[in-house]
């Protein structure tokens, strides 16, 4: 069938299989063109492996270091006239290319927060790899979590803490810049967001993998966070999501102590740059900030996407054969170019004057839009979007029981 983008709010409800495959192909080509990673990881587990930083780290591990990879994610296959989710198509393309290159790649689709999916993953690691996982990437962005032991349901929210936040935001599709007010979160919302986006599940994963002897001596595990400039602090760093990320950082310190004593391993936090992802599109204020950031970083020739960021994380931080450089809080900083003084001063200056009339010229909102559509496989060169495509794509390692068409 012919697949066109259908955008509702900040989400696109359709995905293009060939476009997603092309996008993944571009990332793979980037990784293959880089000098190979010496001393890179060999057996990598990526939790949240189908889009964004998780997918990019899977590609860098596989095509940059020749690693075997297992990816865990929650995606849906095509059903009837409904396309699959982008992460499903991304993984189908990744696995196909990895297998053709002689690389081990298997995936598990299900709720990563559940005990059942953890057990399935452990069984696969024991059966196929006999343990020995030397890198675990934790990259989950989810709106809700069911606690595996208590069954309690937590929903995460993106809200400030303490007081109503007033600033401006942009409707990326129309380019309309308007004032936005966001009411502060309740205590329950703060706790819930921490339960979903904090370090609780990361710790459960690492403890389970350790218990079943799945981790190698010297294992590293990395989770991602964002700090950003003061401009976004109220809604991000000092808001509910920031509170959850503080919990994630605390978890990293605890896991680091455990892994260090048991396996000479490390647990690390990587502070990444702001990028267009399905997760960041949902945060008020942030898309306008990213549109300005893109323009300035592109002008200075220091713009990076997910794949460039993950390449730098692996090459210059995790596997540089030197001590991993961190900030005073022990975090890896690959947001260093974004946070450069000259970049931030320019954004601050433009922020004051940006409005609906000048947003297209002052910012790179067009680049934001382009990246947003690309997440769903649209707007890629060399794809005829007027042509019908087969929307059912198989992920080689996953057997799907066909649902009744809706």
Swiss-Prot record:
The active-site annotation reads: 236 (proton donor)
Residue numbers marked as site, Plays an important role in discriminating NADH against NADPH: 75
Q: What InterPro entries has UniProt attached to this entry?
A: Eno_Rdtase_FAD-bd_dom, Enoyl-CoA_Rdtase_cat_dom, FabV-like_NADH_b, Trans-2-enoyl-CoA_reductase
This entry's Gene Ontology molecular function terms read: enoyl-[acyl-carrier-protein] reductase (NADH) activity; NAD binding; trans-2-enoyl-CoA reductase (NADH) activity
Biological process, per Gene Ontology: fatty acid biosynthetic process
Q: Per the UniProt record, which EC number(s) apply here?
A: 1.3.1.9
- Listed binding positions for NAD(+) are 48-53, 74-75, 111-112, 140-141, 245, 275-277
State the source organism's domain of life: Bacteria
Alphabetically list the UniProt keywords. Fatty acid biosynthesis, Fatty acid metabolism, Lipid biosynthesis, Lipid metabolism, NAD, Oxidoreductase
**Catalysis performed (reactions):** a 2,3-saturated acyl-[ACP] + NAD(+) = a (2E)-enoyl-[ACP] + NADH + H(+)
Residue numbers binding substrate: 226
Which Pfam family, giving just one, matches this sequence? Enoyl_reductase
- Pathway, per Swiss-Prot/TrEMBL? Lipid metabolism; fatty acid biosynthesis
Q: Does the keyword Phosphoprotein apply?
A: no
Q: Which NCBIfam families match?
A: EnoyACPredFabV, PRK13656.1
Q: Which HAMAP family match?
A: FabV_reductase
Quaternary structure?
Monomer.
Please state which protein family the record places this protein in. Belongs to the TER reductase family.
Task: Say what the protein does.
Answer: Involved in the final reduction of the elongation cycle of fatty acid synthesis (FAS II). Catalyzes the reduction of a carbon-carbon double bond in an enoyl moiety that is covalently linked to an acyl carrier protein (ACP).
Name of the protein in its database record = Enoyl-[acyl-carrier-protein] reductase [NADH]
Q: Which organism is it from?
A: Coxiella burnetii (strain Dugway 5J108-111)
**The encoding gene:** fabV
């Amino acid at each position: 069938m012919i697949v066109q983008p259908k955008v509702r709010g900040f989400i696109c409800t359709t995905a293009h299989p060939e476009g997603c495959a092309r996008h993944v192909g571009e990332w793979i080509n980037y990784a293959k063109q880089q000098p190979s990673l010496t001393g890179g990881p060999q057996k990598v587990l990526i939790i949240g492996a189908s889009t964004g930083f998780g997918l990019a780290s899977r590609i860098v591990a596989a095509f940059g270091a020749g690693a075997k990879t297992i990816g865990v994610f929650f995606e849906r296959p095509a059903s009837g006239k409904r396309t699959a989710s982008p992460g499903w198509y991304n993984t189908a393309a990744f696995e196909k290319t990895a297998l053709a290159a002689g690389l081990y790649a298997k995936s598990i689709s299900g709720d990563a927060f559940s005990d059942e999916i953890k057990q399935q993953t452990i069984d696969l690691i024991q059966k196929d790899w006999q343990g020995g996982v030397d890198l675990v990437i934790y990259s989950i962005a989810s709106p809700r979590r069911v606690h595996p032991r208590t069954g309690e349901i937590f929903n995460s929210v993106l809200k400030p803490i303490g007081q109503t936040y007033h600033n401006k935001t942009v409707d990326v599709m129309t380019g309309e810049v308007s004032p936005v007010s966001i009411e502060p979160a309740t205590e329950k919302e703060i706790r819930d967001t921490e339960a979903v986006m904090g370090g609780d599940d990361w710790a459960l994963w690492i403890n389970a993998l350790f218990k079943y002897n799945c981790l190698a001596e010297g294992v590293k595990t990395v989770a991602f966070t964002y700090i950003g400039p003061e401009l976004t602090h109220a809604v991000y760093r000092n808001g509910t999501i920031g509170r959850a990320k503080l919990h994630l950082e605390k978890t990293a310190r605890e896991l680091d102590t455990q892994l260090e004593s048991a396996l000479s391993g490390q647990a690390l936090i990587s502070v990444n740059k702001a990028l267009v992802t399905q997760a960041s599109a949902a945060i008020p204020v942030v898309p306008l900030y990213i549109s300005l950031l893109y323009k300035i970083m592109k002008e200075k020739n220091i713009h990076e996407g997910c794949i460039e960021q993950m390449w730098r994380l692996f090459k210059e931080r995790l596997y540089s054969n030197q001590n991993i450089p961190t900030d005073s809080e022990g975090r890896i900083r690959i947001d260093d170019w974004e946070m450069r003084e000259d970049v931030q001063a320019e954004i601050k200056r433009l922020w004051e004057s940006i409005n609906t009339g000048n947003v297209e010229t002052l910012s790179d909102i067009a680049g934001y839009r382009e990246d947003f559509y690309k997440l769903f496989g649209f707007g890629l060169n060399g794809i005829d979007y007027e042509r019908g495509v087969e929307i059912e794509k198989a992920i080689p390692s996953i057997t799907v029981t066909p649902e009744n068409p809706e």
